[in-house]
């Protein structure tokens, strides 16, 4: 187990147990995804929470002000606990681990689909069917991303499987094939 998981797993497991005992698991998972999105998209927030300059009480007050009406009381307690223990800088890792454990417990496969441009509903539906057959399960969580560097097409990651149907991938494979020939 990687060192970071050694630190984050106990927090994630304990929090999931609390959420289960209060029948809040689905709500907490939705909140975890929202806070993760905020953490990853707002470096000012993550930098402030990770800063050793900001006192623990200031961090807890900021967390209370930001999230008291947005999350369950147990989620707010987790945030304050992480601040108290000087682990709030690991919030994203704790929440990512929480989501991993949640998916493992419910046998949900995570599929990341990165496309060169935004997919319309028909394209998403068609791709979902293909990804379900690749994953071997209908129980999927889809994470859609857009990366214009792919030039066209898409890349699908499901567990350890990668399907690269992007133009950038085709160009790379063509370059490798040409390098072998010469």
Swiss-Prot record:
It holds the Pfam family OSCP. F-type ATPases have 2 components, F(1) - the catalytic core - and F(0) - the membrane proton channel. F(1) has five subunits: alpha(3), beta(3), gamma(1), delta(1), epsilon(1). CF(0) has four main subunits: a(1), b(1), b'(1) and c(10-14). The alpha and beta chains form an alternating ring which encloses part of the gamma chain. F(1) is attached to F(0) by a central stalk formed by the gamma and epsilon chains, while a peripheral stalk is formed by the delta, b and b' chains. The keyword RNA-binding does not apply. It is a peripheral membrane protein. Transmembrane segments: none annotated. The keyword Plastid does not apply. Belongs to the ATPase delta chain family. One of its GO terms (cellular component) is plasma membrane-derived thylakoid membrane. This is ATP synthase subunit delta. F(1)F(0) ATP synthase produces ATP from ADP in the presence of a proton or sodium gradient. F-type ATPases consist of two structural domains, F(1) containing the extramembraneous catalytic core and F(0) containing the membrane proton channel, linked together by a central stalk and a peripheral stalk. During catalysis, ATP synthesis in the catalytic domain of F(1) is coupled via a rotary mechanism of the central stalk subunits to proton translocation. Keywords: ATP synthesis, CF(1), Hydrogen ion transport, Ion transport, Membrane, Thylakoid, Transport. GO terms for molecular function: proton-transporting ATP synthase activity, rotational mechanism. InterPro entries: ATP_synth_OSCP/delta_N_sf (IPR026015), ATPase_OSCP/d_CS (IPR020781), ATPase_OSCP/dsu (IPR000711). NCBIfam families: ATP_synt_delta. It is found in: Cellular thylakoid membrane.
